[in-house]
Amino acid sequence: MGEVGVWPILFSDKDKGRCQRKNGAKTLACEKKSVILHLETYRIMDINPSEIGPKFIDLQRILEQKRVKAPRWVVRMLERLLHIEEINSGIYLNRELSGIDFARAFVEGKEPQNLGIELKLQGLDNIPREGNPMVVGNHPLGGPDGLALMDAVGRVRSDIKFPVNDFLLYLPGLRELFYPIDKVNRSKALATLEEAFASPNTLLYYPAGLCSRLQNGQVRDLEWKATFIKKAVRYQRDIVPAYTDARNRMRFYRLARLRQRLGIKFNFEMALLPAEMYAQRGKAFGITFGKPIPWQTFDKRHTAAEWAQRVKDHVYRLKDNPDATFEP
């Protein structure tokens, strides 16, 4: 879910100046109600459901706090583009829920504020009920697929954690499931990732980082980084491969291709992801969980990068053969 980082930071540097240290150097307690700023990473850590109103994400206020002057018509245009009203309605409807319960309600709930997606799950028995497995999969959608993965794995394990862009902490119902990755501070991001891999939790992980793109006529992930292989070996985590059978609309892929042809590095097609999320409303997609791959498999026969590519290829084989065995 790393690419759903289109949401602006809610608090400006000016806000930090009005805060005081609490508990030594670990946190800053701010005057704003129920908000704690964790030094360099902004985290909403203690929001009571009663404090969540119908307009929880207030784009106008966010822009003002960031000292961005924008005409009202521009704000309205951004609100429509980012589907702020719909996201707020989902947050408000499910404000009493948290963790896996929030993810399941938002993904499968039939209320108009939710997505009402029908999940078709295969291989849930392949998720170990004990130990510290790492569920690794493709990332076709950039949002609802991650929520659906939490929903699905949460039927077997209650201890799931997901490393995500720290902006996603502004979805209060999900924050307890996240390891927030600070995209600005690389050293802090690496430390948080290390903490996630070292934890005893069931870890959900998208090795591509970004959601899938159209490549040679097929929707596939970009390169899978080898980090998950190295950490699986270091922390003795068996890998559960997971294939999600879904895709965004063609306009997302066309915009991504146009950006690439123009030589633009910034992935501005990300701004379409909220619309793509709601385009999944009422649809069905499947998630297939393959047989666990023991961490001891990843030996010196191949480099970590080669192992990562082999696991990626195996994940895509699950589409046609859910019972496929990983071939080293």
Region annotations inferred by a language model:
Residues 42-133, 146-148, 155-157, 168, ...:
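Membrane-anchoring hydrophobic helices of lipid-metabolizing enzymes
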Residues 9, 14, 36-38, 43, ...:
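Short, positively charged and aromatic/hydrophobic N-terminal segments
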Residues 25-29, 41:
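Ala/Thr-enriched low-complexity intrinsically disordered regions
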Residues 190-328:
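Non-catalytic C-terminal accessory region of glycerolipid acyltransferases
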